[in-house]
Amino acid sequence: MYKRQGFFLAFSIPAGLGTAFLYPSIQSCAQKWYAGRKGLATGVIGGAVGLSGAFLTLFVRAALRGFGPVQGIRGAFWALGALTLPVCLAGSAVLSDPPQKKQQPSGKNTLDLSPGQMLRTKQYWLCAGAVCFSTPAVLLFSPIILKLGMERGLDETAALWSIVLGSVGSAAGRMLMPMLSDHIGRRATDLGLFAASLGLSAAFWAARGWWVVVCYAGLTFCYSALAAVLPALSTDLFGLPHAGVNYGFLALGQSVGSLAFPFAANLLALENGRHLLAMAGAAAGFAAIWALHPVQKDPR
Protein backbone atom coordinates (compact mmCIF):
# COMPACT_ATOMS: atom_id res chain seq x y z
CA MET A 1 0.00 0.00 0.00
CA TYR A 2 2.75 2.44 1.00
CA LYS A 3 4.80 1.55 -2.06
CA ARG A 4 1.81 2.29 -4.28
CA GLN A 5 1.28 5.68 -2.62
CA GLY A 6 4.98 6.43 -2.94
CA PHE A 7 4.89 5.61 -6.65
CA PHE A 8 1.98 8.01 -7.18
CA LEU A 9 3.74 10.78 -5.25
CA ALA A 10 7.21 10.26 -6.72
CA PHE A 11 6.28 9.52 -10.33
CA SER A 12 2.64 9.59 -11.41
CA ILE A 13 1.73 13.03 -10.11
CA PRO A 14 4.98 14.83 -11.14
CA ALA A 15 5.00 13.12 -14.55
CA GLY A 16 1.34 13.92 -15.13
CA LEU A 17 1.75 17.56 -14.12
CA GLY A 18 4.92 17.91 -16.17
CA THR A 19 3.21 16.58 -19.28
CA ALA A 20 0.17 18.78 -18.63
CA PHE A 21 2.35 21.90 -18.51
CA LEU A 22 4.84 21.00 -21.24
CA TYR A 23 2.75 19.54 -24.06
CA PRO A 24 0.16 22.36 -24.44
CA SER A 25 2.94 24.96 -24.22
CA ILE A 26 4.87 23.35 -27.06
CA GLN A 27 1.75 22.91 -29.19
CA SER A 28 0.60 26.50 -28.77
CA CYS A 29 4.11 27.85 -29.44
CA ALA A 30 4.42 25.81 -32.65
CA GLN A 31 1.05 27.06 -33.89
CA LYS A 32 2.12 30.66 -33.36
CA TRP A 33 5.25 30.14 -35.47
CA TYR A 34 3.29 28.38 -38.23
CA ALA A 35 -0.10 30.07 -37.94
CA GLY A 36 -0.89 29.34 -41.58
CA ARG A 37 -0.01 25.63 -41.30
CA LYS A 38 -1.09 24.77 -37.79
CA GLY A 39 -1.91 21.17 -38.67
CA LEU A 40 1.60 20.60 -40.00
CA ALA A 41 3.20 22.19 -36.94
CA THR A 42 1.21 20.17 -34.42
CA GLY A 43 1.33 17.01 -36.54
CA VAL A 44 5.12 16.78 -36.46
CA ILE A 45 5.06 17.10 -32.67
CA GLY A 46 2.25 14.58 -32.40
CA GLY A 47 4.10 12.14 -34.65
CA ALA A 48 7.08 12.22 -32.31
CA VAL A 49 4.75 11.52 -29.38
CA GLY A 50 3.27 8.55 -31.20
CA LEU A 51 6.66 7.07 -32.10
CA SER A 52 7.70 7.29 -28.47
CA GLY A 53 5.18 4.55 -27.69
CA ALA A 54 6.98 2.07 -29.93
CA PHE A 55 10.35 3.07 -28.49
CA LEU A 56 9.15 2.75 -24.89
CA THR A 57 7.60 -0.66 -25.51
CA LEU A 58 10.83 -2.08 -26.93
CA PHE A 59 13.06 -0.26 -24.43
CA VAL A 60 11.16 -1.43 -21.35
CA ARG A 61 11.02 -5.03 -22.55
CA ALA A 62 14.78 -4.89 -23.17
CA ALA A 63 15.32 -3.38 -19.72
CA LEU A 64 13.34 -6.18 -18.09
CA ARG A 65 15.72 -8.66 -19.74
CA GLY A 66 18.65 -6.44 -18.77
CA PHE A 67 21.34 -4.76 -20.86
CA GLY A 68 24.48 -3.00 -19.63
CA PRO A 69 23.78 -0.87 -16.56
CA VAL A 70 20.02 -0.90 -17.26
CA GLN A 71 18.54 -3.78 -15.30
CA GLY A 72 14.83 -4.20 -14.64
CA ILE A 73 12.03 -1.67 -14.41
CA ARG A 74 13.88 0.49 -11.87
CA GLY A 75 16.84 0.72 -14.23
CA ALA A 76 14.49 1.66 -17.07
CA PHE A 77 13.11 4.56 -15.00
CA TRP A 78 16.61 5.80 -14.17
CA ALA A 79 17.72 5.57 -17.81
CA LEU A 80 14.63 7.33 -19.13
CA GLY A 81 14.97 10.06 -16.50
CA ALA A 82 18.61 10.61 -17.41
CA LEU A 83 17.64 10.91 -21.08
CA THR A 84 14.52 13.03 -20.61
CA LEU A 85 15.94 15.68 -18.28
CA PRO A 86 18.61 17.17 -20.59
CA VAL A 87 16.40 16.90 -23.68
CA CYS A 88 13.47 18.71 -22.04
CA LEU A 89 15.69 21.32 -20.40
CA ALA A 90 17.45 22.09 -23.67
CA GLY A 91 14.17 22.28 -25.58
CA SER A 92 12.57 24.52 -22.96
CA ALA A 93 15.57 26.87 -23.04
CA VAL A 94 15.10 27.64 -26.75
CA LEU A 95 11.27 27.69 -26.76
CA SER A 96 9.90 31.20 -27.37
CA ASP A 97 6.95 32.84 -29.06
CA PRO A 98 7.44 34.57 -32.43
CA PRO A 99 6.92 38.30 -32.97
CA GLN A 100 3.26 39.26 -32.69
CA LYS A 101 2.87 40.05 -36.41
CA LYS A 102 3.92 36.52 -37.33
CA GLN A 103 1.26 34.89 -35.19
CA GLN A 104 -1.87 35.97 -37.03
CA PRO A 105 -2.51 35.19 -40.72
CA SER A 106 -4.74 37.78 -42.33
CA GLY A 107 -8.45 37.16 -42.05
CA LYS A 108 -8.12 34.19 -39.69
CA ASN A 109 -8.58 33.67 -35.97
CA THR A 110 -10.41 36.97 -35.53
CA LEU A 111 -11.82 35.61 -32.28
CA ASP A 112 -9.47 35.70 -29.31
CA LEU A 113 -11.47 34.11 -26.54
CA SER A 114 -10.20 33.87 -23.00
CA PRO A 115 -10.73 30.57 -21.19
CA GLY A 116 -13.72 32.01 -19.34
CA GLN A 117 -15.34 33.15 -22.58
CA MET A 118 -14.62 29.84 -24.26
CA LEU A 119 -16.25 27.87 -21.44
CA ARG A 120 -19.49 29.77 -22.05
CA THR A 121 -19.76 28.61 -25.67
CA LYS A 122 -21.54 25.48 -26.82
CA GLN A 123 -18.58 24.88 -29.16
CA TYR A 124 -16.38 24.16 -26.16
CA TRP A 125 -18.73 21.53 -24.80
CA LEU A 126 -19.18 19.91 -28.19
CA CYS A 127 -15.40 19.73 -28.69
CA ALA A 128 -14.72 18.45 -25.18
CA GLY A 129 -17.51 15.90 -25.58
CA ALA A 130 -16.10 14.70 -28.90
CA VAL A 131 -12.65 14.31 -27.33
CA CYS A 132 -14.18 12.34 -24.47
CA PHE A 133 -16.06 10.03 -26.85
CA SER A 134 -12.91 9.35 -28.89
CA THR A 135 -11.29 7.48 -26.00
CA PRO A 136 -13.17 4.16 -25.59
CA ALA A 137 -12.24 2.81 -29.03
CA VAL A 138 -8.62 2.40 -27.86
CA LEU A 139 -8.43 2.89 -24.10
CA LEU A 140 -10.92 0.12 -23.35
CA PHE A 141 -8.59 -2.34 -25.07
CA SER A 142 -5.02 -1.08 -24.66
CA PRO A 143 -4.60 -2.62 -21.17
CA ILE A 144 -5.84 -6.03 -22.38
CA ILE A 145 -4.65 -6.10 -25.99
CA LEU A 146 -2.01 -8.81 -25.42
CA LYS A 147 -4.54 -11.02 -23.63
CA LEU A 148 -7.19 -10.30 -26.27
CA GLY A 149 -4.81 -11.11 -29.12
CA MET A 150 -3.84 -14.45 -27.60
CA GLU A 151 -7.49 -15.32 -26.94
CA ARG A 152 -8.17 -14.73 -30.63
CA GLY A 153 -5.48 -16.93 -32.08
CA LEU A 154 -2.15 -15.08 -31.77
CA ASP A 155 0.88 -16.30 -29.86
CA GLU A 156 2.54 -13.92 -27.40
CA THR A 157 5.14 -12.67 -29.90
CA ALA A 158 2.52 -11.97 -32.55
CA ALA A 159 0.25 -10.30 -29.98
CA LEU A 160 3.14 -8.01 -29.03
CA TRP A 161 3.05 -6.65 -32.56
CA SER A 162 -0.34 -5.14 -31.78
CA ILE A 163 1.44 -2.79 -29.37
CA VAL A 164 4.31 -1.98 -31.73
CA LEU A 165 2.11 -1.45 -34.80
CA GLY A 166 -0.40 0.37 -32.64
CA SER A 167 2.35 2.84 -31.77
CA VAL A 168 3.26 3.16 -35.45
CA GLY A 169 -0.41 3.77 -36.27
CA SER A 170 -0.53 6.37 -33.52
CA ALA A 171 2.52 8.18 -34.90
CA ALA A 172 1.15 8.10 -38.45
CA GLY A 173 -2.24 9.41 -37.36
CA ARG A 174 -0.72 12.20 -35.30
CA MET A 175 1.49 13.34 -38.18
CA LEU A 176 -0.64 12.84 -41.29
CA MET A 177 -4.16 13.83 -40.30
CA PRO A 178 -3.37 17.28 -38.87
CA MET A 179 -1.52 17.99 -42.13
CA LEU A 180 -4.55 16.81 -44.10
CA SER A 181 -6.77 19.03 -41.97
CA ASP A 182 -4.83 22.07 -43.23
CA HIS A 183 -6.30 21.29 -46.68
CA ILE A 184 -9.78 19.84 -46.08
CA GLY A 185 -10.63 21.46 -42.75
CA ARG A 186 -10.64 20.26 -39.15
CA ARG A 187 -14.35 19.39 -39.08
CA ALA A 188 -14.23 17.23 -42.21
CA THR A 189 -11.11 15.48 -40.93
CA ASP A 190 -12.68 14.70 -37.56
CA LEU A 191 -15.91 13.46 -39.14
CA GLY A 192 -13.94 11.07 -41.33
CA LEU A 193 -11.90 9.84 -38.37
CA PHE A 194 -14.95 9.18 -36.20
CA ALA A 195 -16.66 7.34 -39.07
CA ALA A 196 -13.54 5.21 -39.58
CA SER A 197 -13.31 4.57 -35.83
CA LEU A 198 -16.92 3.38 -35.80
CA GLY A 199 -16.32 0.97 -38.69
CA LEU A 200 -13.05 -0.33 -37.24
CA SER A 201 -14.65 -0.82 -33.82
CA ALA A 202 -17.30 -3.02 -35.41
CA ALA A 203 -14.65 -4.98 -37.33
CA PHE A 204 -12.50 -5.30 -34.20
CA TRP A 205 -15.38 -7.04 -32.43
CA ALA A 206 -15.28 -9.91 -34.94
CA ALA A 207 -11.53 -9.86 -35.69
CA ARG A 208 -9.37 -12.93 -35.18
CA GLY A 209 -5.70 -13.68 -35.74
CA TRP A 210 -3.69 -10.94 -37.41
CA TRP A 211 -6.86 -8.97 -38.10
CA VAL A 212 -6.80 -8.09 -34.39
CA VAL A 213 -3.46 -6.35 -34.97
CA VAL A 214 -4.70 -4.62 -38.14
CA CYS A 215 -7.90 -3.32 -36.54
CA TYR A 216 -6.13 -2.19 -33.38
CA ALA A 217 -3.47 -0.32 -35.37
CA GLY A 218 -6.26 1.38 -37.35
CA LEU A 219 -8.05 2.36 -34.16
CA THR A 220 -4.88 3.84 -32.65
CA PHE A 221 -4.39 5.78 -35.90
CA CYS A 222 -7.86 7.32 -35.59
CA TYR A 223 -7.68 7.95 -31.85
CA SER A 224 -4.28 9.63 -32.00
CA ALA A 225 -5.22 11.60 -35.11
CA LEU A 226 -8.29 13.01 -33.36
CA ALA A 227 -6.13 14.06 -30.43
CA ALA A 228 -3.55 15.64 -32.76
CA VAL A 229 -6.10 17.67 -34.73
CA LEU A 230 -7.50 19.11 -31.48
CA PRO A 231 -4.90 21.88 -30.90
CA ALA A 232 -5.44 23.33 -34.38
CA LEU A 233 -9.22 22.96 -34.05
CA SER A 234 -9.04 24.81 -30.75
CA THR A 235 -7.21 27.81 -32.20
CA ASP A 236 -9.48 27.85 -35.27
CA LEU A 237 -12.48 28.18 -32.98
CA PHE A 238 -11.15 30.25 -30.09
CA GLY A 239 -8.00 32.05 -31.31
CA LEU A 240 -4.26 31.92 -30.60
CA PRO A 241 -3.50 34.25 -27.65
CA HIS A 242 -4.86 31.81 -25.04
CA ALA A 243 -4.15 28.68 -27.07
CA GLY A 244 -2.29 26.74 -24.39
CA VAL A 245 -4.86 27.20 -21.62
CA ASN A 246 -7.81 26.71 -23.96
CA TYR A 247 -6.30 23.50 -25.28
CA GLY A 248 -5.77 22.32 -21.72
CA PHE A 249 -9.46 22.79 -20.94
CA LEU A 250 -10.43 20.89 -24.09
CA ALA A 251 -8.05 18.08 -23.22
CA LEU A 252 -9.99 17.61 -19.97
CA GLY A 253 -12.50 15.76 -22.14
CA GLN A 254 -9.84 13.17 -22.86
CA SER A 255 -9.03 12.87 -19.17
CA VAL A 256 -12.69 12.30 -18.32
CA GLY A 257 -13.08 9.70 -21.07
CA SER A 258 -9.87 7.87 -20.18
CA LEU A 259 -11.11 7.45 -16.61
CA ALA A 260 -14.87 7.08 -17.04
CA PHE A 261 -15.10 4.52 -19.84
CA PRO A 262 -12.59 1.98 -18.43
CA PHE A 263 -14.14 2.43 -14.96
CA ALA A 264 -17.61 1.75 -16.35
CA ALA A 265 -16.37 -1.27 -18.32
CA ASN A 266 -14.69 -2.77 -15.25
CA LEU A 267 -17.60 -1.95 -12.95
CA LEU A 268 -20.08 -3.63 -15.28
CA ALA A 269 -17.66 -6.50 -16.03
CA LEU A 270 -18.02 -5.88 -19.75
CA GLU A 271 -16.38 -8.23 -22.24
CA ASN A 272 -18.08 -7.99 -25.64
CA GLY A 273 -19.86 -4.96 -24.23
CA ARG A 274 -16.59 -3.06 -24.53
CA HIS A 275 -16.97 -3.18 -28.29
CA LEU A 276 -20.52 -1.82 -28.09
CA LEU A 277 -19.31 0.98 -25.82
CA ALA A 278 -16.53 1.81 -28.29
CA MET A 279 -18.99 1.96 -31.20
CA ALA A 280 -21.40 4.11 -29.20
CA GLY A 281 -18.56 6.49 -28.32
CA ALA A 282 -17.50 6.85 -31.97
CA ALA A 283 -21.10 7.53 -33.02
CA ALA A 284 -21.53 10.14 -30.26
CA GLY A 285 -18.25 11.82 -31.24
CA PHE A 286 -19.38 11.97 -34.88
CA ALA A 287 -22.65 13.61 -33.79
CA ALA A 288 -20.82 16.18 -31.65
CA ILE A 289 -18.51 17.21 -34.49
CA TRP A 290 -21.44 17.26 -36.94
CA ALA A 291 -23.15 19.80 -34.67
CA LEU A 292 -19.98 21.90 -34.34
CA HIS A 293 -19.89 25.25 -36.15
CA PRO A 294 -17.62 28.31 -35.78
CA VAL A 295 -18.16 30.75 -32.94
CA GLN A 296 -19.93 33.75 -34.47
CA LYS A 297 -19.02 36.40 -31.94
CA ASP A 298 -17.39 36.89 -28.57
CA PRO A 299 -19.64 35.55 -25.83
CA ARG A 300 -20.27 38.16 -23.15
Which ranges hold each PLM region?
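Hydrophobic core of transmembrane alpha-helices in multi-pass small-molecule transporters
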Residues: 6-21, 132, 211-225
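Intracellular juxtamembrane helix-capping segments at the cytosolic ends
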Residues: 20-34, 41-42, 225-238
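A late C-terminal transmembrane helix in Major Facilitator Superfamily
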Residues: 44, 53-54, 237-270
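Symmetry-related core transmembrane helices of the 12-TM Major Facilitator Superfamily/SLC fold
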Residues: 74-93, 274-291
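Flexible cytoplasmic inter-helical loops of multi-pass small-molecule transporters
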Residues: 96-113, 299-300
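Extracytoplasmic gate region of multi-pass secondary transporters
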Residues: 116-179
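Helix-to-loop junctions at the C-terminal end of transmembrane segments
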Residues: 174-185, 269
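Structural signature of the two symmetry-related core transmembrane helices
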Residues: 188-203
